[in-house]
Amino acid sequence: EVKLVESGGGLVQPGGSLRLSCATSGFTFTDYYMSWVRQPPGKALEWLGFIRNKABGYTTEYSAVKGRFTISRBBSZGILYLQMNTLRAQDSATYYCARDITEFAYWGZGTLVTVSS
């Protein structure tokens, strides 16, 4: 059974930082590209970026969060990370990790991030 479990969310002040984690199991993590997406309250799902696998150099692609957010992975532990810096109120959302980069057949339940003073 494929499982993805996000953690690390919470309340943070504007300008602050958070690191989200996504623990995975049930598939060969090293084989897959992995993505982060988010859904702000009452809004549509927004793709943030992805990281390729080792075979493709662990290279990354980002949306408009490039420069503030960094995706990384630990293949030995099967964990995906999202480092978020200089957070803004508009970054408040539920954040999800997903396997692959287009058809998100597998993703987690999400972790809520609230950016507020």
Swiss-Prot record:
Tree of life domain: Eukaryota
The Ig-like domain, residue ranges: 1-113
Database matches in InterPro entries: Ig-like_dom (IPR007110), Ig-like_dom_sf (IPR036179), Ig-like_fold (IPR013783), Ig_sub (IPR003599), Ig_V-set (IPR013106), IgHV (IPR050199)
Pfam families hit by this protein: V-set
Gene Ontology molecular function: antigen binding
A cellular component term, taken from the record's GO annotations: extracellular region
Keyword Acyltransferase: no
Keyword entries, A-Z: Adaptive immunity, Immunity, Immunoglobulin
GO biological process: immunoglobulin mediated immune response
SUPFAM superfamilies reported in the protein's UniProt record: Immunoglobulin
Presence of keyword Membrane: no
Additional notes on this entry: This alpha chain was isolated from a myeloma protein that contains one light and one heavy chain per molecule, linked by a disulfide bond. In contrast, normal mouse IgA molecules contain two light and two heavy chains and lack a light-heavy chain disulfide bond.
The protein's name in its UniProt record: Ig heavy chain V region MOPC 47A
